[in-house]
């Protein structure tokens, strides 16, 4: 079984979670999210993530039930479950969004996972990329070897499937993210469409693909930000950038596997560019999907949105029912024993 911190152990029973959710409402981290620390052989360090289990998960009546999983990315593992991540949230988290949708019947029970893909300080992003020059930040806690793609695919996803009652199949697994988290969710789904059936992004900080996806736009303030030096190298290893950029992966990947993923890419409006919206970057990626005759399955622009956590949570309120619809058939088939579980093969990959 996974090793929880003390406060998570206290909340092991779902009913107890609800009581604590009221009693500890003043704490910044949503107490319904459990922090788990695992020893990563890939990163060579201990790495944390949060998980939110559905109501009734611990009850005897549901002991044989398995659940679909949605991974939510930003950078630090706490961001999606931090009530005060910015002032726009007004004390709520994405778990409140999920619970409201569940009560309304717009989604079914699912497991939410919040991976940590940055340094402990959140100053160095990991981007779900295997770092080109990890030695540049050797002393930054939380990075280790910097092999974040391998950590997620080879360790974290199998860990979740082996320690929780998931439906360990791509048809019951999705990803979503905000800002750099949107880069990560679309990147990992385009790179590994065999693992995910649904991928969303709100205001993703995407890079620009050139030359039919073989190159990247070099004059880009995002690409040239020094915080990406360990990830992409200095000077930039443009081949490494292209191999890990969502836009390039969509432009050059196999059409059939990409078309088998539900894409849910959204952004703020053009009027909020350049500092409060990534409208142009999102439109670039959506356009590349369209060039492959692959549909973006959601309204692409939130007309009044800006780049903050209130709108990130609103994005999940829009996309979570669509993620659920993509996974619902797999949930039914798992209940009847039709779907084949694949976690063992993933864990040994």
Task: Report residues per predicted region.
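Non-catalytic cap/lid and distal C-terminal segments of serine-dependent acyl enzymes
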Residues: 2-349
């Amino acid at each position: 079984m996974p090793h929880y911190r003390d406060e998570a152990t206290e909340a092991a029973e779902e009913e107890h979670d609800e009581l604590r959710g009221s009693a500890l409402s003043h704490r910044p981290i949503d107490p319904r999210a459990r922090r788990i620390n695992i020893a990563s052989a890939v990163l060579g360090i201990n790495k944390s993530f949060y998980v939110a289990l559905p109501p009734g998960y611990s009850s005897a009546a549901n002991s044989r039930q398995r659940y679909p999983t949605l991974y939510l990315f930003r950078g630090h593992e706490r961001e999606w479950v931090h009530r005060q991540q910015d002032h726009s949230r007004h004390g709520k988290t994405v778990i409140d969004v999920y619970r409201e949708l569940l009560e309304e019947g717009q989604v079914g029970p699912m497991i939410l996972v919040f991976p940590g893909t940055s340094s402990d300080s959140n100053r160095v992003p990991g981007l779900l990329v295997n770092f080109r020059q990890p030695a540049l930040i050797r002393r930054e806690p939380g990075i280790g070897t910097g092999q974040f793609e391998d950590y997620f695919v080879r360790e974290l996803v199998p860990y979740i499937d082996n320690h929780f009652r998931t439906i360990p199949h791509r048809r019951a697994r999705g990803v979503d993210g905000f800002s750099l988290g949107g880069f990560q969710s679309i990147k990992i789904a385009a790179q590994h469409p065999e693992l995910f059936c649904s991928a969303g992004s709100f205001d993703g900080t995407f890079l620009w693909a050139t030359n039919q996806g073989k190159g990247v736009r070099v004059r880009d303030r995002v690409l040239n930000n020094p915080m990406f030096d360990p990830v992409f190298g200095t000077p930039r290893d443009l081949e490494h950038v292209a191999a890990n950029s969502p836009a390039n992966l969509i432009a050059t990947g196999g059409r059939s596997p990409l078309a088998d993923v539900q894409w849910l890419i959204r952004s703020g409006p053009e009027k909020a560019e350049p500092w409060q919206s990534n409208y142009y970057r999102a439109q670039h990626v959506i356009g590349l999907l369209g060039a492959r005759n692959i549909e973006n399955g959601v309204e692409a622009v939130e007309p009044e949105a800006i780049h903050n956590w209130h709108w990130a949570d609103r994005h999940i309120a829009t996309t979570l029912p669509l993620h659920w619809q993509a996974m619902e058939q797999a949930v039914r088939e798992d209940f009847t024993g039709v779907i084949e579980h694949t976690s063992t093969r993933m864990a040994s990959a």
